């Protein structure tokens, strides 16, 4: 019996867990197949055809990039060359109504996405000489296997003057991790202004705000849009390339052609080493041109704004 128990324990340790997708994991093929035919030169209709699938992918990429970059949670002033900050953060983000009309975007999740979406994260910052600051943030998309990884570099153009506000520029790059079949990256410049007010002793209050311009880049691997495909239907001698039917990629989303603008405002409280903060953010995505792959017609589509509320709790050394 003891030998059996040891064997079972070893099996549990050695064997990997079964693959499982949670409700907020992305299934990108849910956006549909952009090709009206099964393959090049074929007249057979494609499976899961969506004439505006490329536009839906672009709209999704820009919206989810806005979700990934929805928080700043720090004023423009830097920590100083010896400073260090460690924070736990939480963003609550409102998702748009699913659909293809103006103000709608479909997030192709495995199940019904949670709305609002929660994005907890850990944020580490280190002060550098000459008013520079280096930071890193790792966040988790709630109810999914996906994470966000952010690297940032901030430079305070002006800070610490009695009668002048603090002004800073922040460069940042965020990448979605743990996703399947597609890549999503957001990179941009953030321009912030704020002013620290002493409340007595080591207690300060700093209101701040700014504008964040973020470019979005996204692409996909070769996708199989026929999710009911059986192996014996793709190995017939009559069509040795049947396995390539109903496969393809979405049109690439290019960084410099897809820029979101985000306005944010917040306040930070410091009492000794304790740091508290709250921030409201609104990301505006503007319009995109959507092409119909069946008719060749194009139309202008308004993307929804993404509203978020974020909080932070940490230690500032």
Where do the language-model regions lie?
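Bacterial N-terminal signal peptides that target proteins for export
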Residues: 1-8
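N-terminal signal peptide c-region/cleavage motif recognized by signal peptidases
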Residues: 16-18
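Outer-membrane beta-barrel transmembrane domain signature
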Residues: 21-64, 77, 92-97, 101-103, ...
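Transmembrane beta-barrel domains of Gram-negative outer membranes and organellar outer membranes
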Residues: 21-160
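Outer-envelope beta-barrel architecture signal
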Residues: 80-84, 130-132, 147-149, 163-167, ...
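Transmembrane beta-strand segments that form the barrel wall of outer-membrane beta-barrel proteins
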Residues: 86, 128-143, 166-175, 275-284
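Membrane-embedded beta-strand positions in outer-membrane beta-barrel channels/transporters
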Residues: 121-123, 150-152, 190-192, 262-264, ...
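Outer-membrane beta-barrel "beta-signal"
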Residues: 153, 304-317
């Amino acid at each position: 019996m003891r030998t059996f128990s040891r064997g079972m324990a070893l099996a549990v340790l050695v064997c990997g867990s079964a693959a499982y997708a949670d409700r907020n994991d992305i299934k990108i093929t849910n956006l549909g197949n952009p090709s009206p035919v099964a393959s090049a030169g074929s007249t057979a209709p494609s499976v899961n055809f969506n004439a505006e699938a490329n536009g839906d992918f672009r709209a999704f990429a820009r919206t989810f990039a806005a979700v990934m970059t929805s928080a700043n949670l720090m004023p423009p002033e830097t920590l100083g060359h010896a400073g260090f900050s460690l924070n736990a953060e939480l963003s609550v983000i409102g998702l748009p109504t699913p659909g293809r009309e103006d103000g709608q975007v479909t997030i192709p999740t495995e199940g019904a996405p949670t709305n609002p979406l929660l994005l907890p994260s850990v944020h580490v910052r280190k002060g550098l000489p000459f008013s520079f600051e280096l930071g890193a943030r790792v966040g988790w998309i709630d109810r999914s296997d996906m994470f966000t990884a952010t690297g940032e570099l901030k430079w305070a153009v002006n800070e610490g003057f009695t009668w002048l506000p603090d002004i800073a520029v922040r460069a940042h790059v965020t990448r979605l991790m743990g996703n399947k079949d597609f890549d999503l990256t957001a990179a941009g410049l953030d321009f912030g202004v704020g002013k620290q007010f002493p409340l007595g002793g080591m207690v300060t209050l700093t209101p701040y705000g700014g504008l964040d311009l973020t470019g979005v880049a996204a692409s996909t691997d070769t996708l199989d849009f026929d999710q009911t495909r059986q192996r014996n239907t793709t190995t017939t001698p009559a069509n040795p390339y049947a396995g390539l039917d109903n496969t393809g990629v979405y049109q690439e989303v290019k960084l410099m052609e897809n820029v979101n603008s985000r306005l944010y405002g917040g306040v930070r409280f410091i009492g000794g080493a304790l740091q508290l903060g709250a921030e409201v953010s609104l990301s505006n995505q503007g319009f995109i041109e959507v092409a119909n792959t069946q008719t060749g017609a194009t139309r202008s589509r308004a993307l929804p704004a993404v509203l978020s509320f974020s909080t932070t709790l940490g230690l500032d050394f």
